[in-house]
């Protein structure tokens, strides 16, 4: 995060005197900085924290200390990153005051025109960034996005055809017996995803997670010798399991995936291909993963967080083919109680940033640095997982 030339220590000193009394850091910064050297990012950051410090100086102090920590330490946690001050500014505003259940032009509350514009802009930016038919930008976290995607698939492939069979469209009109039968169908579908201990995520069918309670969940693993995905073995298992959803993507697998091959497997076993790209979405947006390594070209539904490699606010999105758009848009109220308008605004800003040449350069450097780190580790005698 670039907020000017001040060091974290100098920034902290703007807020508190030695006796702990809260100062006016914005006034201090502006009075001590020549006009031509005033940094607008610094002004925005300090102005925000000045207001926080007026009410909760301890919280302002903790925020500045976290800034100090992030500036002084190299983070090697794969799921963490740094979002821009532009993104942070978009998130800290009065949009948080607005309820907006539903989706653009289909809200439960009135006066949502501005939120509609924000959400529509974020969705259009996401569609352009990833080259997809539809984007749903409401989910608050990757786990939420996965559950929205799961239920969208269940709605499209199980619920809607079942209702059509009995000539009904409204769930409220079902008899108790019809409702029980539908619930049984929805709760007995199969999911095939990457095993948790092979690098899959909790939400990919791990038994301690709700995903394994929603589905009859099965897992494929990496090859025990190479540590790599064995696509032929996955295909064989998929043909045996016949899952409704074939889930690709990972939380801790350090290689690119051949999504074209997964598409072939899904088509052969009759499954919907879903991809969770939360940990590498930035490499897709940055044009590092292209062709068969770009899940957006092959999957029916793709989910991702917006932080991690996307460098946006903490949140998530669901991307899909037009076939699933209507079902995905039912995420609220099916799964979500409502969107966070201020976070959707920040997502829009982050997506705009990710469409720049500078972002693509950064994304390619991520891969280059990872490869150099791997080489150096090998030269030092370390055994890499793959």
What are these regions (language model features)?
Residues 11, 383-386:
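Conserved PLP-binding catalytic core of the aspartate aminotransferase-like
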Residues 19-121, 264:
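N-terminal glycine-rich, Lys/His-bearing helix-loop that initiates the first secondary-structure elements
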Residues 15-16:
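Aromatic (phenylalanine/tyrosine) cluster motif
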């Amino acid at each position: 995060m670039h907020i000017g030339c001040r060091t974290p220590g100098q920034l902290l000193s703007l807020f508190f005197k030695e006796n702990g009394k809260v100062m006016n850091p914005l006034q201090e910064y502006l009075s001590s900085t020549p006009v031509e050297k005033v940094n607008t990012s610094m002004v925005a950051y300090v102005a925000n924290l000045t207001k926080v410090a007026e009410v909760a100086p301890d919280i302002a102090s903790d925020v500045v200390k976290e800034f100090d920590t992030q500036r002084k330490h190299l983070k090697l946690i794969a799921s963490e990153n740094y979002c821009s001050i532009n993104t942070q500014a978009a998130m800290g505003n009065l949009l948080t005051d607005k309820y907006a259940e539903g989706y653009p032009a289909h809200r439960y509350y009135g006066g949502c025109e501005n939120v509609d514009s924000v959400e529509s802009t974020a969705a259009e930016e996401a569609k352009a960034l990833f080259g997809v038919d539809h984007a749903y930008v409401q989910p608050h976290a990757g786990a939420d996005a996965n559950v929205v995607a799961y239920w969208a698939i269940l709605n499209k492939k199980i619920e809607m055809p079942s209702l059509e069979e009995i000539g009904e469209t409204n769930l409220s009109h079902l008899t108790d017996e019809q409702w029980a039968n539908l619930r049984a169908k929805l709760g007995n579908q199969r999911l095939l995803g990457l095993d948790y201990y092979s690098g899959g995520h909790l939400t990919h069918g791990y038994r301690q997670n709700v995903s394994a309670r929603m589905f009859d969940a099965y897992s494929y693993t990496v090859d025990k010798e190479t540590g790599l995905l064995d696509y032929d073995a996955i295909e064989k298992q998929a043909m045996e399991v016949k899952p409704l959803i074939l889930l690709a993507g990972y939380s801790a697998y350090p290689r690119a995936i051949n999504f074209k091959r997964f598409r072939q497997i899904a088509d052969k076993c009759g499954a919907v291909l879903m991809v969770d790209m939360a940990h590498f979405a930035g490499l897709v947006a940055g044009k590092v993963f292209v062709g068969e390594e770009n899940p957006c070209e092959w999957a029916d539904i793709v989910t991702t967080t917006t932080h991690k490699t996307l460098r946006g606010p903490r949140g998530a999105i669901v991307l899909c083919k037009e076939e699933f758009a209507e079902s995905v848009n039912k995420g609220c109220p099916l799964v979500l109680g409502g969107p966070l308008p201020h976070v959707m605004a920040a997502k829009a800003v982050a997506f705009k940033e990710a469409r720049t040449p500078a972002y693509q350069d950064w994304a390619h450097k991520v891969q280059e640095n990872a490869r150099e780190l791997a080489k150096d580790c090998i030269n030092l005698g370390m055994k890499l997982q793959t």
